[in-house]
A protein has these predicted regions:
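Short beta-strand scaffold segments in enzyme catalytic cores
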Residues: 35-43, 47
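Zinc-dependent deaminase
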Residues: 1-30, 92-160
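Short loop/turn microsegments at loop-to-beta-strand junctions
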Residues: 33-35, 84
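Immediate flanking context of iron-sulfur cluster ligation sites
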Residues: 78-90
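Glycine/small-residue-rich phosphate/adenosyl-binding loop
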Residues: 47-48, 65-74
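Residues that line or immediately flank small-molecule/substrate-binding pockets and catalytic motifs
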Residues: 42, 88, 112
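A short, polar/charged loop-to-alpha-helix boundary motif
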Residues: 54-66
Length: 160
């Protein structure tokens, strides 16, 4: 059974989500969709990443979540990240949700919902499928206001 806990709060954000938002801002400054991700292990940040899909990267898998998971696996020397938590500014897509399940992330914290491309509580709801082999604890709505604003600003600029 997957547990989903909405964490909307007017209180200060935890440091990992603040760092994820900084990564999202950095990605936007590089012309990338503003998404940032952080992996923590035993409460310490071990990996940070923003989206990196555009030149010079040209990587269709260059989503912040995948990049942060790769870094964390490298730091820990294992692809099994079952004692790690992932903090991301936007609801993960199907590809990223699959990577989260494969890495066996313990807890997923995310900011803004993504009704069009998300796959956690939107779309295919990957972790709720019988074929999903791992289901992290899910905490949504953490830093959603700032994450949503970054996305709105980015796409408003793109449409100009």
């Amino acid at each position: 059974m997957v547990s989903v806990i909405s964490t909307f709060s007017p209180f200060p954000l935890p440091e990992p989500m603040r760092q994820a938002l900084l990564q999202a801002e950095s990605a936007a400054n590089q012309g990338e969709v503003p998404v940032g991700a952080v992996v923590t292990f035993q409460g310490k940040i071990i990996a940070v990443a923003g989206n990196a899909m555009q030149p010079p990267f040209v990587d269709p898998t260059g989503h912040a979540e995948v990049r942060a998971l790769r870094q964390a696996a490298s730091v820990l020397g294992s692809s099994r990240l079952d004692q790690c938590d992932l903090w991301v500014t936007l609801e993960p897509c199907a590809m990223c949700a699959g990577a989260i399940a494969t890495a066996r992330i313990r807890r997923l914290y995310y900011g803004a919902d993504d009704p069009k491309g998300g796959a956690v509580l939107s779309g295919v709801r990957l972790f709720f499928q019988p074929s999903c082999h791992h289901q992290p604890e899910i905490y949504n709505d953490l830093g959603s206001r700032r994450a949503s604003e970054l996305l709105r600003q980015f796409f408003k600029q793109k449409r100009k």
